[in-house]
Regions:
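Flexible, glycine/charged-enriched surface loops at secondary-structure junctions
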Residues: 97-106, 129-137, 226-234, 242-254
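Glycine-rich phosphate/diphosphate-binding loop of Rossmann-like nucleotide-binding domains
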Residues: 68-140, 152
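Short, small-residue-biased leader/transition segments that mark boundaries at the very start
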Residues: 2-9
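Short, acidic/small-residue loops that bind anionic groups at enzyme active sites
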Residues: 18-35, 128-135, 180-193, 203
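Flexible glycine-/small-residue-enriched beta->alpha junction loops
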Residues: 12-81
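Glycine-rich phosphate/nucleotide-binding loop
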Residues: 146-232, 236-245
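Short beta-strand segments
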Residues: 8, 30-32, 50-54, 105, ...
Length: 268
């Protein structure tokens, strides 16, 4: 989806923002898991994080203007409706997947009204899930803790801007954006995507890592009820990484995009 168009639109900042708003895709879900055999700074940790990012408002509403020459204003929009929906999405998923902890990440110590409302909604939803431990963490501290002790995190619940930043930080823990999938989910529609950019400088050179796209397909197949196909593709990707003899250059291998893809196909 990121590759369709990268220039700004008249109303929205990007195609991504336009689709999320038009289709009501309020949940951005990004699972962050360590792949077998992949050498990273944290390869000795069995990292398995789930990030739930509100997808439709915050500073991404595109409401900014020049007040006077040299002074601009950008509006941060936080609503009870959107905050409650993303909190419910995170807790319902955590309940289904038997996750133990949800942490809401915020800056309510400074933005007392906007982030304060987000936390109020998170607390209300959390009260309906007594079996899941709920906590809150200021965003700057959360960034430090993710780098120092990433294994202490389970499910992260965030407004749009913090979620955008921290989801990329988390991807760096397990090998980068070429690894991690993404899903944009609403009540009636869903879009699945690799969250990295288009990288036009390497187009056609066989250098791109298709893992994030493949893992996004794993999420999509599970979402539409094709669980067997989802599991087969997931297992094929993991087996390819575990063998380590056909990986792309960004993760320490020598394989081309097509060679890696062929290896995954052989393991299906």
């Amino acid at each position: 989806m990121t590759g369709v168009q990268t220039c700004a639109l008249p109303i929205y900042q990007s195609i991504n923002v336009a689709l999320r708003k038009k289709l009501g895709l309020y949940t951005n879900f990004r699972p962050v898991r360590m792949l077998p055999g992949l050498k990273t700074r944290y390869h000795d940790l069995a990292l398995d994080l789930a990030i739930f990012r509100e997808n439709t408002e915050d500073l991404y509403s595109g409401l900014e203007h020049e007040v006077v020459p040299g002074v601009v204003e950008s509006l941060k929009i936080i609503t009870e409706k959107a905050s409650t929906k993303i909190a419910r999405s995170a807790f319902e998923w955590s309940h289904r997947e038997r996750r133990k902890k949800v942490v809401a990440i915020h800056k309510a110590n400074i933005m007392k009204l906007s982030d304060g409302l987000f936390l109020k909604c998170c607390r209300e939803v959390a009260s309906h899930f007594p079996g899941i431990a709920y906590s809150e963490l200021i965003v700057d501290n959360a960034c430090m803790q993710l780098v120092m002790r990433p294994e202490t995190f389970d499910v992260l619940l965030l407004p749009n801007l913090y979620g955008d930043i921290i989801s990329d930080l988390a991807a760096g823990l397990v090998g980068g954006l070429g690894i991690v999938p993404g899903a944009n989910i609403g009540d009636h529609h869903a879009i699945f995507e690799a969250v990295h950019g288009t990288a036009p400088d390497i187009a056609g050179k066989g250098l791109a890592n298709p893992t994030a796209l493949m893992q996004s397909a794993v999420l999509m197949l599970a979402h539409i009820g094709e669980r067997e196909a989802s599991v087969r593709l997931h297992n094929a990707i993991y087996q390819t990484y575990a063998e380590r003899d056909c990986l792309t250059g960004d993760v320490g291998g020598m394989a081309s995009t097509n060679e890696f893809t062929d290896a995954v196909i052989r393991h299906l």
